[in-house]
Structure formats: C-alpha cells, structure tokens
C-alpha cells in the first residue's frame, strides 16, 4: 500500500533502485555459485574471500530490507495491533518512539521485529545477522525525495502512519 503515501513515479523509481541492487547481487552470485540460495547468516560461514563476503553482505541485506519495505504498509484501520498497544500503552506511543528513533538517521532502515522491537540500521553488513524484520521503513533519500523533496519528516510521518502493525508478532 505504498500508493497511500507515495506517487506511482516515486514507487517505480524506488523499485528500479532495488532492482539495480538485486542485479548487482545476481552478478556476484553468478560468479560465486556458493552464494546461490544463501541467506545472510550463511554469508558468515561460507568460504569466501574478504572482498566477496563484504560485497555480498552489503547487497543481500539491502535486497531483503527493500522486499520487507515494499510489503510493510496498509490502508489504516484502527486498532491495528493489540500487541503494540499492550507493549507500549498505545499505537500512538509506539509510532512516536519509532519517529524519534528514525528522525536523526540520514540513511538506512528503521526495522521492526518480533515483539515490536525496533532499531535503525545503517550498517547493512550487520543488519540481518540475527533475524529478518517484520516491517521496514527506508530512510534514504531515494525512498521519498521525488514526492517529499527535503521534507523528510513529512515522509516519515506518512510512512509510519501506514505501517501494517498487524504483522508484528511475539
């Protein structure tokens, strides 16, 4: 439901950006067969030279985070999450915490995981070392600039308002 707060042009631009990352990874994957079907956790144990591991750890988490981002939103209907309300007191309190966590980050992803845990990830190499997020908000300029220009705060408020909080589990 990105269309709730992003234009078709912006969505197409962002999906093209994600496609370029996926293309770079597929080229790396074609040259290193051991990457085929590997998850982020696998990249730490595979026998790769340092440069190939660094490249894979830079690209694969971004692919996964963009996939999560593109599926993180919905048309808002309240209440959206009993779990979030029980952990944080209200959805508004949770969204306010997310906003405060993300407002200072100049790039990366705001990720939300099980139990409504959240963090801002700016180091893609370590982003998904433990668990994949349930929801993600892209904080980089390519995510919002066509529609919001330099008004990043307005993008962030709109994105947070449309998060599909029902996807959050324990």
Regions found by a protein language model. Give the residues of each.
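Feature for soluble, non-membrane regions of globular proteins
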Residues: 1-170
């Amino acid at each position: 439901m990105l269309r709730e707060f992003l234009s078709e042009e912006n969505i197409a631009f962002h999906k093209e950006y994600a496609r370029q990352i996926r293309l770079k990874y597929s080229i790396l994957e074609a040259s290193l067969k051991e990457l085929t079907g590997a998850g982020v956790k696998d990249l730490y144990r595979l026998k790769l030279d340092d440069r190939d591991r660094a490249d894979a750890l830079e690209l694969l988490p971004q692919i996964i985070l963009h996939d999560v981002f593109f599926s993180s939103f919905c048309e808002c209907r309240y209440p959206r999450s009993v779990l979030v309300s029980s952990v944080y007191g209200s959805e508004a309190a949770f969204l306010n915490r997310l906003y405060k966590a993300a407002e200072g980050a100049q790039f990366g992803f705001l990720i939300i995981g099980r139990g409504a845990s959240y963090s801002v990830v700016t180091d893609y190499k370590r982003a998904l070392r433990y668990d994949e997020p349930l929801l993600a908000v892209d904080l980089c300029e390519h995510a919002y600039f066509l529609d919001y220009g330099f008004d990043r705060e307005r993008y962030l408020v709109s994105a947070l308002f449309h998060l599909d909080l029902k996807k959050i589990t324990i």
